[in-house]
Amino acid sequence: MAKIIYPLQKDTIVEDDHRALAQWINTNPLPRLTMGPLVKKFEDKWSNWLGVKYSVACNSGSSANLLMYYALLRSGRLKNKKIIVPSAAWVTTVAPAIQLGFEPIMCEADPKTFGLDISHLEKLLKKYRPSTVIMVQVLGVPNDMAQIMKLKNKYKFFLLEDTCAAMGSQYKGRKLGTYGDMTSVSTYFGHQFSTIEGGLVSTNDRQFYDLLLMLRSHGWLSGLDPKTRAGLLKKYKIEDMGTHFIFCEPGFNFRLTDLQAFIGLRQLEKMDWLVENRSRNHNLYKNLLSPNFGMQEYDAKSTICSIHFCALAKDKEERKKIIAALDENGIETRPFTSGNQGLHPYWFREYGKFNAPMANRLYDCGFFLPNYPTLSESDIKFICSVITKTALKNRS
């Protein structure tokens, strides 16, 4: 491969952030670096930006997904452990269902959004009557949320919303991450904004929030407000000895650090700029590539803040040629990250292969293109010219 000129992603933590972090670390008295007051400040600022009541920061988007599943399981509110999972997803959207003993049922990908196929989803809802559906807002492009919320009201399921790659996107003016009973985001390198590693779970449900706080930190009472803490001590008939070393849940240690929260707070200051530039880039890719390639579709009233742009080649062979041409020109790419989750060993070893037309097409034909805030219009035009010339040459 040629030297990478156009990486798939660039860090949103820039020189000014490094300098500010160095200055903060060396303040007198020296600041606490493990989880402390800055994490809470970061959680509150994110909740305010997103428009939700509560957020719990953790060490990764994958942990955020696991916490959502586990809080739901520990809540005692499930009528069964059946859950519909998406075929077009990252592995840690689906894996907690297996890890925690749910009964996952896979759903076909939608030809327009690459999210949940609405027709197949309703068939599965009718047949299995699951307690839960988890969805992914794939690469920042919203699912058909109007239809999904209608189905939620009709079939009374809990909705977990994975927006790990969709921070800043909107469906007809409403931010993604505000539809689910719980929603997850990832603040890993290359995502809309970064805390080095990290994630958050957001919710408007107080019971879920209290469970998330406990499950993130060993299952203990530390972090709960005094009234909730007192209620749990009374419920379990435990004397309050002024210690938080009382464990009400079998939890994890998924905590974020104040060091990461310091960076996150700075990142949120430029969130609107990050969203605006990624959205501009996504729309330009769409306009330039739509005549010749398959891609996600979305309503004109929606805002798309993607971490990559995904295009679909005609077939496997064309994708190979396009990837080779991109490599030769220093443009980093990859196949649609994992495509159809139902074709990976962790899934088919347990449940058999999930073969569905659209999910398989993503697996065979999808490829990613760079998107980051400093990518210019001329950069995108060059990238698109490489792809288009390669494809049209081989189609003639």
Named regions from a protein language model:
Residues 129, 156, 180-181, 293:
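Residue-level detector of structured alpha->beta connecting loops
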